[in-house]
UniProtKB/Swiss-Prot annotation:
Binds 1 dipyrromethane group covalently. The gene is hemC. GO terms for molecular function: hydroxymethylbilane synthase activity. Belongs to the HMBS family. Monomer. The porphobilinogen subunits are added to the dipyrromethane group. PANTHER family: PORPHOBILINOGEN DEAMINASE. Its cofactor is dipyrromethane. It catalyses: 4 porphobilinogen + H2O = hydroxymethylbilane + 4 NH4(+). Pathway: Porphyrin-containing compound metabolism; protoporphyrin-IX biosynthesis; coproporphyrinogen-III from 5-aminolevulinate: step 2/4. This is Porphobilinogen deaminase. It is an enzyme of class 2 (transferase). CDD domains: PBP2_EcHMBS_like.
Length: 308
C-alpha cells in the first residue's frame, strides 16, 4: 500500500516526517511511503509575531487541505501546533513518544538566564515564554524572533541577540546542542512548556485501514499527558497565541501538573501545581482549567489578547 505524508519543508518538520516514515516502514514492510512538502501560512508570514497573525492552524491548514483533497494520507505535526478541533474527515490518529518537554536557554556569551546583563536582548516570539522570562527577569529586553531553528541560531551567532529561547526537543532532534556554546534547559518550575510540547501528533484521513497502520506510533504515556494538556487548553479556549503554559508529567502512578496563564508583560500571573492519581487523568485538564477560570483565568486571557 502507498502512503503519502504531507509535511512542512523546514528541517525540523522534514526530520519529524522522516522519523515517522522510518517507524512505519520498520513495522509494516508492505508500505511504500513518500513525503510531499508544503509551505504553511505560519512559514510564509515571518514578518509578524504569531500572536498578531492570529487564527488557529497556522502550521497545519495547508497540510489538512492536502489530505482532504486526497493528495496525501497523513501529516506529522509538532502536537503543540495542532488545534483541539479537526476538520470533518480528519482525525488525530496517533501521538508519539515524547521528547524532553523543557524550553532551553541558548547563548554564545552567557551560561544562563541569571548571567545575562541588565537589559540583555532575548529572542522569542512566544508570549508564554515572554511572560515567564519577565517574571524571572523583569529587566530583560524581549524581542520577537521568527523563522526556523537554523535561521534563529544564525541570528544568535550574528550577535543580534544575547540569548534566545527554543524548545529543547527541536534542538535535540536536529543534533544542534554542540553548535551553541551555552545550552541550558529550564526547570519546569521556572518555565512551564506549551501544551503537548515535545510530542508529535499524527493526523490522518479517517480511514480504518490507515488508522490500523498508524496504531504502532502511539505512546500510552504521551497520550495521557497530552490529553490532560489539550483538555486544559480546550476548556480555557486558548491557543498558541496567548500566554498559557501547561505540563502534565507521569511519575510512577501519579501525575504532576503545572499550569500558568497571565499577561505578556508578567504584570498578572495565575499559576497552579498539583499531583493527582494517574487513574484520574481523563477529566484532570478540564477540572484544573475550571478551577483557574473561577480564579479569573478567562479575564486575564481576554486582557492578554487586548495587549497583543
Amino acid at each position: 500500500m502507498q502512503l503519502i505524508i504531507a509535511t512542512r519543508k523546514s528541517q525540523l518538520a522534514l526530520w519529524q516526517s522522516e522519523y515517522i516514515k522510518n517507524k512505519l516502514s520498520q513495522t509494516h514492510s508492505d508500505l511504500e511511503i513518500s513525503l510531499e512538502g508544503f509551505k504553511t501560512k505560519g512559514d510564509v508570514l515571518l514578518d509578524s509575531p504569531l500572536a498578531k497573525i492570529g487564527g488557529k492552524g497556522l502550521f497545519t491548514k495547508e497540510l489538512e487541505e492536502s489530505m482532504l483533497r486526497g493528495d496525501s494520507h497523513l501529516a506529522v505535526h509538532s502536537l503543540k501546533d495542532v488545534p483541539s478541533f479537526f476538520p470533518k474527515g480528519l482525525v488525530l490518529a496517533a501521538i508519539s513518544k515524547r521528547e524532553e518537554v523543557n524550553d532551553a536557554f541558548l547563548s554564545e556569551y552567557y551560561e544562563s538566564l541569571n548571567a545575562l546583563p541588565k537589559g540583555a536582548k532575548v529572542g522569542t516570539t512566544s508570549l508564554r515564554r515572554r511572560m515567564q522570562l519577565l517574571a524571572l527577569r523583569p529587566d530583560l529586553n524581549i524581542i520577537s524572533l521568527r523563522g526556523n531553528i537554523n535561521s534563529r541560531l544564525e541570528k544568535l551567532k550574528a550577535k543580534e541577540f544575547d540569548a534566545i529561547i527554543l524548545a529543547f526537543a527541536g534542538i535535540k532532534r536536529l543534533g544542534l546542542e554542540k553548535q551553541i556554546k551555552f545550552v541550558k534547559k529550564f526547570e519546569l518550575d521556572e518555565m512551564i512548556p506549551a501544551a503537548s510540547q515535545g510530542a508529535l501528533g499524527i493526523e490522518s484521513i479517517d480511514d480504518k485501514q490507515i488508522l490500523k497502520y498508524l496504531e504502532c506510533l502511539n505512546d500510552k504515556n504521551a497520550f495521557v499527558e497530552t490529553h490532560i494538556e489539550r483538555d486544559f487548553i480546550k476548556t480555557l479556549e486558548g491557543g498558541c497565541q496567548v500566554p498559557i503554559g501547561i505540563n502534565a508529567k507521569i511519575i510512577d502512578e501519579k501525575i504532576e501538573i503545572r499550569a500558568i496563564v497571565g499577561l505578556p508583560d508578567a504584570s498578572k500571573i495565575l499559576k497552579e501545581k498539583r499531583m493527582i492519581d494517574k487513574q484520574d487523568y481523563a477529566k484532570a485538564g478540564e477540572l484544573l482549567a475550571k478551577e483557574m477560570i473561577a480564579k479569573g483565568a478567562k479575564e486575564i486571557l481576554k486582557e492578554a489578547e487586548s495587549m497583543i
